[in-house]
Regions:
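Glycine-/small-residue-enriched transmembrane alpha-helix faces in small-molecule transporters
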Residues: 1-45, 148-178, 196-197, 263, ...
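Hydrophobic alpha-helical transmembrane segments of multi-pass integral membrane proteins
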Residues: 11-16, 42-58, 72-76, 130-138, ...
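Specific transmembrane alpha-helical segments of multi-pass solute transporters/efflux pumps
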Residues: 20-28, 57-106, 114, 142, ...
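Membrane-interface helix termini and inter-helical loops of multi-pass transporters
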Residues: 29-38, 94, 144-155, 203-222, ...
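Hydrophobic/aromatic residues within transmembrane alpha-helices
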Residues: 34, 44, 48, 92, ...
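Specific alpha-helical transmembrane segments that line the substrate/conduction pathway
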Residues: 43-54, 81, 90-124, 165, ...
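Helix-helix packing/entry segments at the starts of transmembrane helices
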Residues: 47, 86, 101-108, 175-196, ...
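Hydrophobic transmembrane alpha-helices of multi-pass small-molecule transport proteins
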Residues: 56, 77, 128-147, 198, ...
Length: 300
């Protein structure tokens, strides 16, 4: 890429990716807050799938499930790859802090996407991508296990959930890119499919606390989970992937640990340590390189 048009395309894709990152970072904080109430991971998943599924049924009825483009395996990757991370991340948050979620779910997911894209989409794992990931990974580790963090066994359980969530999301990304689905179309297939599969099971599940939780807590989760995260962020993410490619578009997710740390300043009054500021700088530089920033175009 070297023309002004290419630069404009990159900036458009980067803007979509950055907006998605802001929503994802907020989702991690809000999900953690929800789990501090009597809401369970099952309740939060029901709110996400129920709200998003109902809102997107009319759109999916017009567009269809695109099985001719996805194939049955691709359809399964979209539905399950969109649903599984919700459960995996929410259960992980029961064991490990939000910083680990941000670092190991969206933070490591771009590496999974790059490896799968090289295998299934023939996207080159270029020198610039290798350099970018070499910058991102130390930053992710520094935020997750910096000073004051430990490798407690219970946290390790949560970390495994977060990594599994990232891998599931990577399969969603590859299926969407391979079928060239729009972000909203993929979000609709995932949301409606998840709603049809999950809500009948949830209706007979013991231990739900939705009826006893304050309406403000329920409304917050419904809006953030069902509208912002399950619909808007997937639209933005899909646009970034369609413009920049699977691995380059997904690279913006690695900014989530840094964005979460920055959001914690005004929301939680938690200031990053000097090491975390350094990690934020490393991650930001790595994402810029992997995503195809102008200075790396000549090396791709």
């Amino acid at each position: 890429m070297s023309t002004d048009n290419d630069r404009a395309q990159y900036l458009r894709g980067a803007l979509y990716g950055l907006m998605a990152v802001v929503i994802w970072s907020g989702w991690i904080v809000v999900a953690r807050l929800g789990l501090r109430t009597s809401l369970t991971p099952w309740d939060i998943a029901a709110l996400r799938f129920g709200v998003a599924g109902v809102l997107l049924v009319p759109y999916l009825a017009r567009k269809g499930i695109a099985v001719e483009r996805l194939g049955w395996s691709g359809l399964a990757a979209i539905v399950l790859g969109g649903a599984a991370p919700v459960f995996l991340a929410n259960f992980g948050l029961k064991f490990a802090p939000a910083a680990h979620a941000g670092a190991l779910f969206p933070g490591v997911m771009p590496l999974f996407v790059a490896l799968l894209a090289a295998a299934f989409l023939q996207e080159d794992f270029t020198k610039s991508k290798k350099l970018g990931f070499a910058l991102i990974m130390p930053g992710v580790v520094a935020i997750a296990w910096g000073p004051g963090e430990s490798l407690a066994s219970s946290q390790n359980i949560g970390d495994v959930f977060f990594l599994a969530a990232g891998l599931a999301w990577a399969f969603y990304t590859i299926a969407m890119r391979k079928a060239r689905l729009g972000g909203l179309h993929a979000a609709a297939i995932s949301a409606v499919g998840s709603m049809l599969i999950y809500l009948p099971v949830f209706a007979f599940m013991p231990g739900t606390t939705l009826a006893s939780v304050s309406w403000t807590d329920v409304a917050l989760q419904a809006i953030v989970q069902g509208v912002l995260t399950a619909i808007l962020s997937l639209m933005l993410y899909g646009r970034a992937v369609s413009i920049l490619g699977a691995s380059s578009g997904a690279a913006f997710a690695a900014l989530c640990p840094a964005m979460t740390a920055l959001l914690a300043i005004p929301i939680l009054g938690e200031w990053p340590t000097p090491i975390e500021w350094g990690a934020i700088s490393l991650i930001s530089a790595g994402v810029y390189v992997v995503s195809g920033g102008p200075l790396s175009w000549s090396k791709r």
